[in-house]
């Protein structure tokens, strides 16, 4: 039997493996992680630095994997920004998601337009630590840093084209989730202006990667949001 689908859009520097932590819990969805080129299973492909190219790439992956059942788009951080653009493309393609769930991101237009992707290596690493921290094992390995920093720089270039997303308004309901210690958590309602439908915010405990410590709550939000959005159809 086909299951409803949950498409997972990773954060900057992430890949299809970024949501493996969800698999240790029962989840009533077919989980379908997608990834940008240059990492994970697509490591040999050229990195993208354009917002439009990125959302078109993800849109193509999703349309290829739709099973005909209702589905949700979920993105964390960078994935949230991309999720908005992808939802817009899906709606224009007459294959709309049940809803868009975003986390770790208060929406387009809030982050200063400074060019962070071009920072010197030490400053770039310091900025990443300030935003949400890097794993200690990554900081201790120049080899790992050499591999991941070009990916992160490319992903930040995509983020820096956020002006493309600032005027996007979708028909799908939007559910926004942030950690109570995140920098822009008090502006979570910024997402409300990007939907013509319902909007619901959640604030959980934690910093930028609060999703790893709130798995059960996150899955509950997936289930509740799916059911609530289904009732709006």
Spans of model-derived segments:
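Non-catalytic, mobile gating and regulatory segments of ester bond hydrolases
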Residues: 1-233
């Amino acid at each position: 039997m086909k299951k409803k689908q949950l498409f997972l859009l990773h954060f900057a520097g992430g890949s299809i493996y970024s949501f493996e932590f969800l698999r240790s819990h029962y989840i009533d969805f077919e989980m379908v992680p997608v990834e940008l080129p240059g990492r994970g299973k697509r490591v040999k492909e050229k990195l993208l630095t354009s917002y439009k190219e990125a959302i078109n790439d993800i849109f193509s992956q999703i349309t290829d994997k739709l099973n005909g059942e209702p589905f949700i788009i979920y993105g964390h951080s960078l994935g949230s920004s991309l999720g908005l653009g992808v939802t817009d493309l899906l709606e224009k393609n007459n294959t709309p998601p049940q809803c868009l769930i975003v986390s770790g991101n208060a929406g387009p237009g809030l982050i200063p337009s400074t060019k962070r992707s071009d920072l010197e290596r030490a400053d770039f690493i310091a900025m990443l630590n300030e935003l949400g921290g890097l794993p200690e094992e990554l900081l201790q390995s120049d080899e790992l840093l050499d591999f991941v920093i070009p990916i992160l720089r490319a992903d930040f270039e995509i983020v820096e084209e956020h002006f493309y997303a600032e005027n996007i308004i979708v028909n799908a309901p939007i559910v926004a989730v942030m950690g109570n210690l995140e920098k822009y958590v008090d502006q979570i309602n910024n997402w409300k202006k990007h939907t013509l439908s319902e909007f619901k915010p959640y604030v959980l405990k934690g910093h930028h990667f609060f999703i790893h410590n709130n798995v059960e709550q996150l899955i509950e939000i997936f289930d509740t949001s799916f059911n609530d959005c289904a009732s709006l159809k």
